[in-house]
């Protein structure tokens, strides 16, 4: 089994994560863990794995869907609480598209799950109209939303400080 690039010390956590931005019919597919905000589908990069390989693996594990990874949208430096410790996360976000539109429901929401450190995390996957992002729907990291809505074809850098 491969090892996620996720390091914990007594004082902090470091995480290397990749997320996919899947947009179809003016809707974006987001994941929502129970009792948490919406986030972009993805996960921790494993040692010796490319970010594109990680995204393909995560979409297959969580959604049983095959994707193609398109252009790099953003590089994020994200600082947030991980339990009682501060976490410094480097995140890459890519546009992605389904190889087969019939792999997942094309509207509404559906259930799935993931594992983090051998703990099962139940997830809801929801198609959200892009208009709701403009109206303040809470999505993590929120700094990425303006770039998605701008539909610019360039890679951006952002910093998200939640601590």
Q: At which residue positions do the language-model features occur?
A:
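Short, well-ordered beta-strand micro-motif
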Residues: 22, 95-97, 127-129
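A short coil-to-beta-strand element that immediately follows conserved catalytic motifs
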Residues: 66-75
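Short, charged/polar surface micro-motifs in flexible loops or helix N-caps
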Residues: 26-28, 35-37, 46, 75-78, ...
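Acidic, metal-coordinating catalytic segment for phosphate/diphosphate chemistry
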Residues: 1-19
């Amino acid at each position: 089994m491969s090892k996620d690039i996720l390091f914990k010390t007594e004082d902090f956590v470091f995480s290397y994560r990749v997320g996919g931005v899947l947009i179809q019919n003016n809707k974006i597919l987001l994941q929502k863990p129970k009792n948490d905000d919406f986030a972009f589908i993805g996960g921790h990069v494993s040692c010796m794995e490319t970010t594109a390989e990680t995204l393909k693996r995560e979409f297959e594990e969580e959604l049983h869907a095959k994707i193609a990874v398109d252009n790099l949208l953003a590089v994020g430096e994200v600082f947030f609480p991980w339990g009682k410790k501060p976490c410094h996360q480097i995140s890459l976000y890519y546009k992605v598209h389904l190889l087969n539109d019939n792999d997942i429901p094309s509207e509404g929401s559906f259930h799935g799950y993931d594992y983090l450190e051998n703990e099962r995390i139940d997830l809801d996957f929801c198609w959200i109209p892009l208009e709701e992002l403009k109206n303040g729907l809470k999505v993590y990291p929120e700094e990425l939303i303006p770039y998605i809505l701008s539909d610019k074809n360039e890679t951006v850098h952002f910093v998200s400080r939640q601590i």
